[in-house]
Amino acid sequence: MSVGVAVLGSGNIGTDLMIKVLRLSDSLRMVAMAGIDPDSDGLARARRLGVTTTAEGVAGLVALPEFADVALVFDATSAGAHRHHDAVLRAHGRTVVDLTPAAVGPYVVPPVNLDEHLRETNVNMVTCGGQATVPIVAAVGRVTPVTYGEIVASIAAKSAGPGTRANIDEFTETTARAIEVVGGAELGKAIIVLNPADPPLLMRDTVYCLCPDTDADRSAIAAAIADMVRAVQEYVPGYCLKQDVQFDRVDSYLPALGRRLTGLQVSTFLEVSGAGHYLPTYAGNLDIMTSAALRTAERLIARRAVTA
């Protein structure tokens, strides 16, 4: 039996997520979409697909008769708006999957720590860069400690809508924190690049892990990364390594750490292409977010069904 869900936000991410629920999920049923722009393509598309809509935001959503059938809400708006949305939805007893960088609930990256948070009523999907790179930091950390993790996420400028651009500062802060909290690095840093190239390029991510053990088992690290890539590919088929993992000895002063580090640098180069459900395939940054959110919601619902 499927469980009713709603999407807050009728932009690129919200619309792609709606289509994923409709096309891919056996356990989730798309009930409603709420936005604030009555002329948005997302709301128009939802209406064409037979999904109930409102342009009155979260207030309009909870006022819909169909809201009674909604058990879980995806929030695909902005970090600032989410705090209000969470308060409203929490008061109505709804579970929330947050696709903004607000991080009201715990960070969740499905192949790394989803099992730890299945009882939560609000979970945060970090950022697109976080979903792509935190698994790699965590994979390295399963073999050897990571002192410093730095990621560079390069995304097509055309894939960055108003919501993404409004959240740029929160993107870097939230991703860096997730590198530490979920990835396990002592210190994390995140950089995002909006690539204006036309035709647009696929999402590329570079992950640097600095490890204090120069003699760490390189084969074991490479194998752990390969295993993690396969785990992500279960729900994001377009996620892949672009080349072999690189290893370099380092012995230098790191301003971010405020000290000298002698150890091993592990460099991982990733590419993410989207599934093309609603967004172009170059928007892998958005696709990995919606795919991770869908995977998370299905697991949350399954956990509740087992314990009901």
UniProtKB/Swiss-Prot annotation:
Gene3D superfamilies: Dihydrodipicolinate Reductase, domain 2 (3.30.360.10), NAD(P)-binding Rossmann-like Domain (3.40.50.720). InterPro entries: Acetaldehyde_dehydrogenase, Acetylaldehyde_DH_C, NAD(P)-bd_dom_sf, Semialdehyde_DH_NAD-bd. CDD domains: ALDH_C. Its EC number is 1.2.1.10. GO terms for biological process: catabolic process. It is an enzyme of class 1 (oxidoreductase). It comes from the Bacteria. The active site is at C128. Keywords: Aromatic hydrocarbons catabolism, NAD, Oxidoreductase. It catalyses: acetaldehyde + NAD(+) + CoA = acetyl-CoA + NADH + H(+). NAD(+) binds at S10, G11, N12, I13, S159, A160, G161, P162, G163, T164, R165, A166, N167, N285. GO terms for molecular function: acetaldehyde dehydrogenase (acetylating) activity; NAD binding. Belongs to the acetaldehyde dehydrogenase family. This is Acetaldehyde dehydrogenase. It comes from Salinispora tropica (strain ATCC BAA-916 / DSM 44818 / JCM 13857 / NBRC 105044 / CNB-440).
